[in-house]
Amino acid sequence: MKISECMTQDVRLVSPDDTIERAAQMMGSADTGVLPVSDGERLVGMITDRDIAIRGVAEGCGPSARVGDIMSREVKYCFDDAEADEVLVNMAEIQVRRMPVVDHDKRLVGIISLADLDREEPARSGHALREITQPSGTHNQSR
């Protein structure tokens, strides 16, 4: 199955010049934890609720801070004609739950999530989720 057959096509976008307050409000109304950041038709980053909390609020940025100042610039993406099982393996390897989908002109056409893939390939998405939720570093909240 191709990613274009199971991706979410109605994707909300923010601009690098939008405020993190606006991004957080959009996440809340869309019930999502991630928004692609675009400059016109070009995908230039991603911003997550974690980015807002860790790179924004925890670093003293106020609600008027710009998305472009705290977004992740290194965007991992897949093509709309990629096979779903290959994308799922890639998502597990790079430990992401959501990935922007672009066409071969690198224009954003959708977003794929583990939930989207779970509807199509539940057994494989469970394995990917286990890989994604493995800690990538030392974490200790037992103190």
Kindly label every feature range from the protein language model:
Residues 13-31, 38, 78-95, 102-103, ...:
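The conserved cystathionine-beta-synthase
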Residues 1-11, 65-75, 132:
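Bateman (tandem CBS) regulatory domains
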Residues 41-42, 46-86:
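A contiguous binding-surface segment within folded domains or other stable secondary-structure elements
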Residues 4, 12, 21, 53-54, ...:
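Nucleotide phosphate-binding site architecture
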Residues 6, 27-30, 35-51, 91, ...:
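A glycine-centered beta-loop-beta connector
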Residues 83, 104-143:
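Cytosolic regulatory modules rich in charged/polar residues
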